[in-house]
Amino acid sequence: MCVFNLIALALLLHAQLGSSFILSCYFTNWAQYRPPPTIYMPNDIDPCLCTHLLYAFATIKNNQLSTYEWNDVELYSQFNGLKNKNGNLKTLLSVGGWNFGSTGFSQMVLSPTNRQTFINSVISFLRKYEFDGLDIDWEYPANRGGSPEDKQYYSVFLEEMRAAFEKEAKQTNRARLLMSAAVSAGKDTIDSAYQIPKLGQALDMINVMTYDFHGSWDPMTGECSPLFRGPEDQGGFIYFNVDYAMNYWKSQGAPAEKLIVGFPTYGNTFTLRNPADHGVGAPIAGAGTPGKYTQEAGELAYFEICGFLKDGATEVWNQAQDVPYAYKGNQWVGYDNRKSFQIKVDWLTKSNYGGAMVWTIDMDDYLGTFCNQGKYPLINVLKKGLNLDQHNPWKQLWRQLWRKLQRGHQWHEQRVLRWKEPVLQLQQWRDLLWKMCCWAGL
């Protein structure tokens, strides 16, 4: 069979066999400041790992979308350049975040003029830097210094932005810019912040932050992202689990296929009041010791947790909530591992949710040297569980094509090699096949 037919067949089969699930991964523009060897830049991202990459964070200045870090523009170029290696990859710019708070958003959505100013700046900004969409991380409407009217005006803002994106796409004959939002998983916040059916209509993806259910702000230990309610959960804590949060969003009118389940690649840490009392719900004295690389009290990246375990920490499987925790001395961490990710992604697919969201890509063991589980061990569990790794017999076809190029075979079928004039060089075909192998999940 000629190379042209092989390529055409492989592309067709890939399109037919692809997964419909989304795997969105956040990149943080402060990971560049970590000590070596954990400095993480956009060029370090595997372009074939996730279906959507979200760049955190941009900010709002004078009701306009704006950069935050001094070198964001340079990093944008690296980030969006990843699409040259994976033509199916989508990139979104995320604006806001926990530290940005609520006031800036609240002031922007309050008036039609402010909303229009922001929306116009978004379209211009995203097109200029070649993003495919915007992710709004407002934490949270009508909370943390926001206005009670935020709930209503947030919906109006999203509807207006959706209409503006659709209008711009028609006028320019380009693909419509995508819209996603990071939203709360806490019942009280959900009730006060969101008109869920309207969000479900306007947004393409609803990224539910199903993590940080427990942390050092509580008086006792607890899991960061438990799948189910635990026996210790009483009162308002009965709502603090992934299963309840996702079902609540769905029951209030959010389309299941737009609901994206949040997966943390970190754990929340605690300092025990009594090292001998080290179960779930044990009293604490405060946040856990900062990690060597992330350097933030109360939190450890997954690759740091692997170091904690190697240093002799005891790992316990929390059967009731399908997540692990670990302790050593007066230090305690509730987190996720490959086993809990597998259980959760199986639950996700059976529940017919739209996919998984990862916070963050740079806190997984991306080097593969800390946990000895390969590169990106947690995210790869999701990729496989969502059927995004493309394990199918047609991989052999792609490998055959790649090997031919690696051996330097010269292909002379002019209808394949000629792109106008002159004949494509071998290196160009190698680059093309690299992209095709990426698309096929190789």
Task: State the predicted function of each range.
Residues C2-S20, M436:
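Cleavable N-terminal signal peptides of Sec/SRP-targeted secreted and luminal proteins
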Residues Q16-L126, Q152, L158-E160, Q373-L397:
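Glycan-recognition patch characteristic of GH18 chitinases/ENGases
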Residues Y26, V95, H214-G236, F263-W347, ...:
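Glycan-binding loop/region signatures in secreted carbohydrate-active enzymes
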Residues F27-N29, F57, L93-G97, W138-Y140, ...:
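A cross-domain feature marking catalytic cores of carbohydrate-active enzymes
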Residues L53, L93, I136, M161, ...:
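Conserved, mostly hydrophobic/aromatic
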Residues Q64-V73, P141-I305:
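Substrate-binding surface in catalytic domains of secreted glycosidases
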Residues L110-L134, F157-A164, D191-A202:
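An active-site-proximal structural segment forming one wall of the substrate-binding cleft
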Residues R418, P422, L426-L442:
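Cleavable C-terminal sorting propeptides in eukaryotic secreted/cell-surface proteins
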